[in-house]
């Protein structure tokens, strides 16, 4: 796959940032590293899982960790990984704040910021901004936390079906979407409505044929299990982090916890992990295709 960015550092309409997006297992980081080497860039990770410390195998982190959220991949610096403990929460608004700071730092060095990842809402928030969302309400949260995950899903399904379906297996996001809906009377998507761009950017998204994508995700899931993801999960639990913490709610980790609790076999673990990863990758593919101002690269 050949990738041409049509990017010229001497262009009078110089871009502030480059964005490389796409579904999981599509080769985003590889392309970002190639571009950074050619155009003197640094990567800003846009991945809601790679922000967590101690979880490397299951989030497919690459390169060598240096310090303070900084990694080096084949000589290229990557920012905004390993910045939170597994029990800390993160949001699109927080990502925008952190990414804005890194973009400014990279531009001051005369380099190109290359935002790379598959967390679509973070990318959209960075490029177009967020509509004002209500802050967390302690009283409401206390009430919502008494409900089961299925109950949260059922209630949200009536008022914001898109957010309910998208986050049905993530209790933290279900709770937040319901909280936002109750406090504002609006859906999550309405809060992510398009605005004027915040940056002069070039957005390139890798689109992969579903058959190829399914094969790649299946191979990746099997490789992660064989490479120590089960042991990685157990290590985090042994450190005292709760099995329901933010980081362990992600695909793969929650399946491994079921396996460790002897609720499913290792064979079922791999099957369920692979299936949910395939579905997630397909949703990512669909989401990026629906976004404005994107140039696509096809497998």
Swiss-Prot record:
Function as written in the Swiss-Prot or TrEMBL entry: Catalyzes the transfer of a dimethylallyl group onto the adenine at position 37 in tRNAs that read codons beginning with uridine, leading to the formation of N6-(dimethylallyl)adenosine (i(6)A).
This enzyme's EC code(s): 2.5.1.75
Region (Interaction with substrate tRNA): 47-50, 172-176
Full protein name: tRNA dimethylallyltransferase
Any GO BP: tRNA modification
Family membership noted in the UniProt record: Belongs to the IPP transferase family.
Binding, substrate: 24-29
HAMAP family to which the protein is assigned, alphabetical: IPP_trans (MF_00185)
Positions bearing the site annotation: Interaction with substrate tRNA: 119
Keyword field contains Nucleotide-binding: yes
Reaction catalyzed: adenosine(37) in tRNA + dimethylallyl diphosphate = N(6)-dimethylallyladenosine(37) in tRNA + diphosphate
Self-association and partners: Monomer.
Species this chain originates from: Endomicrobium trichonymphae
An MF annotation (GO) of this entry: ATP binding
Keywords noted in UniProt: ATP-binding, Magnesium, Nucleotide-binding, Transferase, tRNA processing
Entry annotated with the keyword Plastid: no
Cofactor: Mg(2+)
Positions bound to ATP: 22-29
């Amino acid at each position: 796959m050949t990738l041409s960015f049509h990017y010229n550092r001497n262009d009078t309409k110089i871009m502030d940032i480059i964005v490389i997006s796409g579904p999981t297992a599509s080769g985003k980081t590889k392309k970002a590293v190639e571009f950074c080497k050619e155009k003197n860039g640094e990567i800003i990770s846009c991945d809601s899982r790679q922000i967590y410390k101690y979880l490397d195998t299951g989030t497919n982190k690459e390169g060598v960790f240096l310090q303070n959220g900084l990694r080096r991949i084949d000589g290229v610096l990557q920012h905004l990984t390993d910045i939170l403990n597994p029990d800390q929460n993160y949001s699109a608004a927080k990502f925008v704040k952190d990414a804005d700071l890194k973009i400014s730092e990279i531009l001051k060095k005369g380099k190109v910021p290359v935002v790379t990842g598959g967390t679509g809402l973070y990318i959209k928030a960075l490029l177009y901004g967020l509509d004002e969302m209500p802050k967390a309400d302690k009283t409401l949260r206390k009430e919502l936390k008494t409900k089961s995950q299925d109950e949260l899903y059922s209630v949200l399904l009536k008022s914001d079906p898109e957010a309910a379906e998208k986050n049905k297996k993530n209790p933290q996001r279900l709770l937040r979407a319901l909280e936002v809906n109750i406090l504002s009377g609006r859906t999550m998507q309405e809060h992510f409505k398009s605005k004027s761009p915040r940056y002069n950017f070039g957005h390139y998204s890798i689109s992969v044929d579903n058959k190829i994508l399914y094969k790649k995700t299946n191979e990746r899931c099997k490789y992660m299990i064989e490479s120590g993801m089960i042991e990685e999960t157990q290590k985090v639990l042994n450190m005292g982090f709760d099995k329901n913490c933010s980081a362990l709610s992600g695909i793969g980790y929650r399946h491994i916890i079921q396996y460790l609790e002897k609720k499913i076999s290792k064979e079922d673990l791999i099957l369920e992990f692979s299936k949910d990863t395939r579905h997630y990758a397909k949703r990512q593919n669909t989401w990026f295709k629906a976004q404005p101002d994107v140039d696509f690269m096809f497998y």
